[in-house]
Amino acid sequence: MYCRICPLAVMLAFAGTAFCQDITDLKLKNFRPVSIYNTPQTSVDKAKYPVIDFHSHDYPKSDAEVDAWIKTMDETNIAKSIILTYSTGVRFDSLVAKYSRYKNRFDVWCGFDYTGQDKQGWVAHAVAELERCHAKGAKGVGELGDKGLGELYSKPTPGYGLHIDDPQMKPLLEKCAELHMPVSIHVAEDAWMYLNADSTNDGLMNSATWKVDLTKPGILNHDQLVASLENAVKNNPKTTFIACHFANCCSNLGALGRLFDKYPNLYADIAARYAEIAPVPRYTKAFMEKYADRLVYGTDMGTSEKMYRITFHILETADEHFYEHDYFSYHWPLYGLNLSAGTLKKIYSGNASHIISE
């Protein structure tokens, strides 16, 4: 088989994950371009400033893995990680205990308890459980999650049919304000996931994996879900909200900017959307510099050193046309945003410190 650009070194580098394949047999899922541009590439081993990761989860399976995570955090300059558990009850209590050896390095957030939501009085029970979790150590609530059918990111009981702007949610959101518990919420998915999975979709492989089925009865679409978030933010001005993943408005950051302009109680994390924003560096940089006071760093991609360093590479450098196939399923080249020092300080930890100290 003949490949015009397929040196032995490239073949060896991708052994086991990809291979040189003739174009007549090439499948998009096997497309692993290697940049041919001889441009500077910067290695960023640790963040330029201390970081609070505002979007992480309960990845470790043992105390030893928690210890290993701490070591990685030390080596990459992650000062603290927010563990979004979705959880209440016994599960939440067990996670508080799991991370209690490193109280200054982890904040453990709870979920909402939707048990008995089809019965009268469930909200009072949910508020009581929220208060209990707070007393147990919960610093915030999240990650709530609604991809169209309701608040399904909850353990042990999902909130089918309940959207964040449902009147039944208001007592919970008001209690969050009273207890100074910020609310982290994922609404919708990015626009690619609502498009046809065909040759016109430029995020095809990733969008096909996460495609939203709008034929399901009662499901809300992207704009309806963002509207539900806006309603909740507007109707609960004393509650602090963090919209996960740029509110899934990566293809139209202006929509998020309009919300920032209207609602001072709204923030957004940048977790797990590096591959969506890095292909448009000038547009993204201008947005992030303008709204530097409203964005917080997040990962949502595990605990590896390489993962953290990829995020720093994108945020801190001006490097051009590189790929990270191990972490991102798109086929777009990535570009560094080269954010200013002031913006990095705010996104890495300044805004997060303000949110969790309010």
Label for each model-derived stretch:
Residues Q21-N104:
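An N-terminally biased module of ancient metal coordination in phosphate/nucleic-acid-related enzymes
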Residues H55, M73, C133, V141, ...:
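Conserved, mostly hydrophobic/aromatic
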Residues I52-S56, K80-I83, F106-G111, V141-E143, ...:
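Hydrophobic faces of well-ordered beta-strands that scaffold small-molecule active sites
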Residues K61-M73, K119-C133, A255:
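Short, acidic/polar
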Residues S35, S62-D63, I70, D223-N231, ...:
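H/E-rich (His + Asp/Glu) clusters that bind or coordinate divalent metals
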Residues C6-T17:
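Bacterial N-terminal signal peptides
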